[in-house]
A protein has these predicted regions:
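A short beta-strand-loop structural module common to alpha/beta enzyme folds
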Residues: 53-62
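Serine residues within intrinsically disordered or low-complexity segments
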Residues: 11, 23-25, 147
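N-terminal leader/linker segments that precede catalytic domains of diphosphate-processing enzymes
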Residues: 132-133, 313-386, 392-445, 489-497
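Anionic-ligand binding patches
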Residues: 30-33, 72-315
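N-terminal beta1-alpha1 ligand-phosphate binding loop
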Residues: 30-51
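NUDIX/MutT-family hydrolases
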Residues: 239-241, 448-489
Length: 497
């Protein structure tokens, strides 16, 4: 069994009978949308249409997908029709992300052990000196140091704590929806993807000068809860002006045409040289809003159920002062990202809270913990330059374990299928919390950590005895002694497993 049919066999355990309820004419919950693409134009189209998607890059080998399809049909890749090509790639991207989320959901579902919750604010007074900001502009995003506070704690089974959250990938009857897209440009009967190099872009732009071509975009929308799939293609005809050699060279110098299908954009530098279009403008940018809406409705979901951005939010950048350091230009904004004014007197990242994975490696003979995965935080981040564990904001619709697993993969390549969750610690501040998820590599499995995004300077296995020698994130410095004791105790508890 393979391809999209495989989804249904692996989706049966996901489906539950609960449904969303209406309040007046609107749903009371937003259904999350996951975009299987790192394309900024596609993200922007959705964002300005009121949808902030979770971004999950598929890492699909596009050449291999097309080569395999051509071989199955006994033809060459060039003989595959353009609508078939874009549809195959859109399906492959959606399916790859679906499988990645299945792995996250499975590991979270199999999580065991105890959830220990600390309530530090119950042990301090509102006028505690530690609540005041230190005068440094960076202090507002620096975690308070509770190392000298006797923190009240509660303990409950981890799965019981997750059930109490009332959210998660397997907790909904609908969604999240996963959208895969792929675009190609057809000129003189030949399909073109991204040129990647200036030389290829130059040759293509010269052929496009004064010509007419077609932009095709495949869309595959998949409902994670039910495994249902809807798919379709959009097409638009474009008429180009004459391009001078000067224009071509200057356009290539912008870098814009190198990483877009057909070597041009409607919403960028190239837009002024498109003299006319017939068809859907958003499809030319890489995601047809009308088609995406139609596919959503085919799955029985209202398009407006995906709205999770207010009109004002579409034009506001929420960025507290961090000593003048700003995130990279291409940094991705996800649903759940944002600063919370916490009761502790500081700002914390994650409107749904935040979570990370404390992954430990054990000696194969003794079972003792030898290393943990650590993240050297990017300079632009809160407390940049310090060491902690990979993690971040919990996205809409995720529970804490799922959020930690997704974030740790995105940041550090901690693959969920290779680890087992054995407990957690939640520091609860009331309106915000951070959950540290304790995990071991599965027996016979290895995790190969690396920096997957711009939020880390480096990711590495660090010997457990050397952790205190690093410049640690405030919360990590405070919690590490108890975390180390718990990791060692968990290793004894799970010895031989």
């Amino acid at each position: 069994m393979h391809g999209l049919m495989w989804i249904f066999a692996h989706s049966l355990w996901l489906y539950k009978a609960n449904t969303y309820t209406r309040s007046s004419s609107l749903y009371t919950m937003t259904i999350p949308l996951i975009l299987a693409s790192k394309s900024k134009p596609r993200r922007d189209i959705l964002f300005h249409a009121g949808i902030c998607p979770t971004i999950r890059v598929s890492h699909v080998d596009e050449d291999a997908v097309l080569a395999r399809a051509a071989q199955e049909h006994g033809i060459t890749v060039d003989e595959l029709p353009i609508d078939t090509k874009v549809m195959l790639l859109a399906e492959a991207k959606a399916l790859a992300v679906y499988e990645a989320y299945l792995a996250v959901a499975k590991t979270a579902r199999e999580a065991r052990g105890e959830c220990v919750t600390g309530h530090p604010l119950d042990a301090v007074t509102p006028d505690d000196p530690a609540a005041a900001l230190a005068g440094d502009a960076r202090a507002e995003t620096q975690t308070r140091d509770f190392s000298n506070v006797r923190i009240p704690r509660t303990v409950e089974p981890l799965q019981q704590a997750l059930a109490a959250e009332g959210r998660g990938l397997t907790a909904a009857g609908v969604g999240p929806l996963i959208l895969g897209c792929d675009s190609m440009f057809l000129l003189d009967g030949k399909a073109y993807g991204k040129p990647h190099t200036p030389e290829v872009a130059r040759e293509r732009l010269r052929r496009m000068s004064g010509a007419t071509g077609e932009l095709w975009t495949g869309h595959c929308l998949l409902d994670f809860a039910t495994g249902r799939v809807a798919k379709g293609t959009s097409k638009a005809t474009l008429h180009f002006s004459k391009f001078s050699d000067v224009m071509i060279e200057r356009y290539i110098a912008t870098g814009e045409p190198l990483e877009v299908a057909g070597s041009f954009t409607l919403d960028g530098f190239g837009g002024a040289f498109i003299e006319g279009i017939e068809g859907d403008p958003s499809g030319i940018i890489g995601l047809s809003l009308p088609l995406a809406r139609q596919l959503t409705e085919q799955l029985g979901v209202e398009w407006t159920d995906l709205w999770n951005v207010t009109r004002d939010e579409r034009f506001v950048v929420d960025a507290p002062n961090n000593g003048g350091k700003l995130p990279p230009k291409g940094n991705v904004h996800q649903p759940g990202d944002g600063w919370v004014d916490c009761a502790c007197g500081r700002k914390h990242w994650g409107t749904n809270g935040a979570a990370g994975v404390l992954l430990a490696r054990r000696d194969t003979q003794t079972g003792e913990v030898t290393h943990i995965v650590m993240q050297h935080r990017a300079a632009w981040s809160a407390e940049g330059g310090t060491w902690g564990i990979p993690g971040g904001a919990i996205a809409d619709g995720e529970n804490t374990i799922e959020g930690a697993l997704r974030e740790s993969f995105e940041e550090a390549n901690i693959t969920p299928e290779d680890i087992e969750v054995v407990g957690s610690y939640c520091e609860d501040h009331g309106p915000w919390s951070y959950t540290t998820v304790f995990a071991f590599e599965k027996p016979g499995h290895e995790v190969h950590p690396r920096a997957n995004d711009d939020e880390s300077m480096e990711i590495m296995w660090v010997p457990i005895d050397e952790v205190p020698d690093r410049k640690l994130l405030t919360a990590m410095r405070t919690d590490w002694p108890s975390f180390e004791r718990r990791l060692r105790a968990l290793a004894v508890e799970h010895k031989g497993e």
